[in-house]
Regions:
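Short acidic active-site motifs
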Residues: 6-7, 19, 72
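Conserved active-site-proximal phosphate/metal-binding subdomains
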Residues: 13, 29-62, 68-228
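Conserved radical SAM core fold
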Residues: 7, 26-29
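Short, ordered loop/turn segments at secondary-structure junctions
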Residues: 3-4, 24-25, 89
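Non-cysteine beta-strand/loop elements that form the S-adenosyl-L-methionine
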Residues: 17-25
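A cross-family glycoside hydrolase active-site/sugar-binding cleft signature
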Residues: 1-2, 22, 62-64
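Active-site glycine- and acidic-residue-rich loops that bind
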Residues: 1-10, 67
Length: 228
């Protein structure tokens, strides 16, 4: 995983078979290893072509971070990526195993609802900002080193979630979570209309159907030469 072009060159020089170019928008833990300066880390749109140029056509570059629909996939391919890695979208799939508290927060996800924080594990990771993150600040020098921070919080998280509260919950997702939620609700509405059913709009599309939909959207965008 490379979060800068410098890291991509290092990985290439050390014989990796492929590189995941992880933009600043990506959910979950950061893969940075040559720099700890989070403020200087590029987003996916800027990172992918620089990683592609850094390694040439010798190994594939996989784009990751903020890619939530076919438009994002098409954009990554146009920037030179050989493939994409998508995570947050699948949190909304029927097979998703995220807990009820996490699901409730995902349903109301929006574009400015995530932060990079070291509070939960001692390492920077992107997720929905809960009460703990808001009160301690997303990045704190008081946090124990990885992985001790996560162990210390487990009991608090479990007790709060038993009460349906997300105060101490690590709810990893990327900056595209709001778009993922909108797409999931649209798929749910189409399902309900087709099957004359009602119920939860999110978490009804299977991972297989989601993958097919995303691929079809991307192919349509690439075929037309525009992202609509």
């Amino acid at each position: 995983c490379a979060t800068t072009a410098q890291e991509a060159r290092w990985l290439h020089a050390n014989g990796v078979d492929g590189i995941i170019a992880q933009g600043y928008e990506a959910g979950g833990h950061r893969g940075n290893f040559l720099t700890q300066d989070l403020a200087a880390q590029p987003g996916t749109l800027a990172l992918v072509p620089q990683c592609v140029d850094a390694v040439g056509d010798e190994i594939p570059v996989i784009a990751a971070g903020g890619i939530a629909d076919g438009r994002g996939i098409a954009a990554a391919i146009m920037l030179g990526a050989s493939a994409v890695q998508i995570g947050t979208s699948y949190l909304f799939s029927k097979e998703s195993t995220v807990g009820s508290v996490h699901r409730a927060e995902l349903r109301q996800a929006h574009d400015s609802g995530t932060v990079l924080t070291n509070i939960f594990s001692g390492k920077p990771a992107r997720g929905i900002a809960c009460r703990l993150v808001k009160e301690m600040g997303p990045i704190s020098d008081l946090v124990p080193p990885y992985p001790d921070a996560g162990v210390a919080l487990k009991r608090l998280q479990h007790r709060a979630e038993q009460q349906g509260r997300a105060d101490f919950s690590m709810m990893w997702c990327g900056q595209g979570a709001g778009l993922c939620a909108a797409k999931a609700k649209q798929a749910g509405q189409e399902r309900n209309a087709r099957d004359r059913a009602s119920g939860d709009l999110c978490f009804v599309e299977s991972a297989t159907d989601m993958t097919i939909r995303l691929a079809d959207e991307a192919q349509s965008c690439l075929a037309m030469g525009i992202t609509q």
